A protein has these predicted regions:
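PLP-dependent class I/II
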Residues: 1-117
Length: 117
């Protein structure tokens, strides 16, 4: 293992590393809450986001997960993952992540809400 990798691993376990890690996790979980709150405000059933930065929602209006991908990308310029990418059981669902900053997350939520209403 390279020296740089060893030092990076060591830094994670320092007080500063722990502080930064906790800050990042709290940011991502806060973003996930913003996403779930936004989806639920327009009666979209969603799952996840409480213990991870991934949020799944049921694709509305009988669309396939790929149709939802196309709609979000081309209409509101938001990218996510079609559920069918996880196998046939994922069809009918769509996955979003909370790996953006708070401002970009709120912007994406508003775009999604406007694109799905």
């Amino acid at each position: 293992m390279s020296y740089i990798t060893q030092r990076a691993a060591e830094a994670v376990y320092s007080d500063e590393g722990r502080r930064q890690l906790k800050e990042n996790i709290n940011c991502y979980l806060g973003n996930a809450k913003k996403i779930t709150d936004g989806l639920e405000s327009i009666n979209i059933r969603c799952f996840g986001g409480r213990n991870s930065p991934y949020i799944w929602f049921e694709v509305p209006n009988g669309l396939t997960s790929w149709q939802m991908f196309d709609r979000l990308l081309n209409t509101v310029q938001v990218v996510g993952t079609p559920g069918s990418g996880f196998g046939t059981i994922g069809e009918g669902y769509f996955r979003l992540t909370a790996f953006a900053g708070p401002k970009r997350t709120l912007e994406a939520v508003e775009r999604i809400k406007n694109g799905l209403i």
